[in-house]
């Protein structure tokens, strides 16, 4: 048996619950990803605007759309509430990142860690899961935190674990990331990896290879070849495949990315 904990529970509350249950029921806690702006996720915004119920796993994250305020006698005149160069985000929560508290969460009695995957790319899930797996295996926290900055995310918060969400709940800054996702590795052909273009890769660019359970490996992309085996200076057409030499045991399930 397993109980999925509400995201507004603090570390002290989780510890008290674990002690009361005395190991009879496992505890699962959400540790990374988008956080609902409504208490306990009881939000009807997505259901009202899109017909997709947040309470049935179908949230369209409508709270992250751009909103403005209008007065009924001034139709068409929009009043910004909290605006920057990217728009107004009055309902947007920061993203949860519990990496700094991971040891404390486990010590409190949590036995299952939940990471957001719905509405995210395979690259996002692979990067985040790999970062937490490395940390659980003893990797340096700084390295793992750097990995979490690589994916597209809103400014991070540790949420309600230490009540930080009450002090800085919103993220008007928008999304940020430090890496560009280039291609998934879909196979291997001798000493070359077979990749599928997601974003343009120019020959000579320094790239990183993301491999499960390991820190990323940097190398320079050289000797790119298209689907017909002919040399190309760049892999640029989304969906097309290309090959190139790669270090180590790179293969299907790995990802290529580069600094922005």
What are these regions (language model features)?
Residues 1:
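Conserved thiamine diphosphate
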Residues 4-5, 11-112, 119-260:
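Active-site pocket-lining/capping segments in soluble small-molecule metabolic enzymes
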């Amino acid at each position: 048996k397993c109980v999925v904990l509400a995201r507004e529970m603090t570390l002290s509350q989780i510890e008290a619950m674990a002690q009361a249950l005395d190991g009879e029921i496992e505890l699962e806690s959400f540790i990374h990803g988008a956080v609902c702006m409504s208490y306990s996720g009881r939000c009807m915004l997505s259901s009202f605007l899109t017909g997709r119920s947040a309470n049935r796993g179908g949230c369209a994250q409508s709270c992250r759309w751009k909103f403005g305020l209008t007065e009924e006698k001034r139709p068409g005149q929009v009043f910004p509430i909290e605006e920057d160069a990217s728009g107004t985000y009055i309902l947007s929560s920061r993203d949860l990142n519990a990496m700094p508290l991971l040891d404390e969460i486990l010590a409190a009695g949590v036995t299952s860690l939940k990471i957001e995957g719905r509405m995210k790319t395979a690259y996002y899930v692979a990067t985040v899961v790999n970062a937490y797996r490395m940390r659980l295996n003893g990797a340096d926290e700084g390295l793992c935190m750097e990995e979490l900055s690589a994916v597209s995310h809103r400014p991070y918060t540790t949420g309600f674990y230490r009540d930080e969400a009450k002090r800085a709940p919103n993220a008007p800054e928008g999304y940020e990331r430090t890496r560009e996702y280039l291609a998934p590795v879909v196979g291997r052909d001798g000493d070359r990896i077979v990749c599928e273009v997601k974003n343009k890769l120019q020959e000579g660019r320094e790239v990183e290879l993301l491999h499960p359970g390991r820190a990323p490996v940097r190398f320079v992309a050289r000797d790119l070849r298209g689907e017909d085996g002919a040399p190309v200076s760049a892999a640029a057409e989304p969906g097309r495949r290309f090959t190139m030499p790669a270090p180590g045991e790179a293969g299907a399930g790995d990802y290529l990315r580069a600094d922005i």
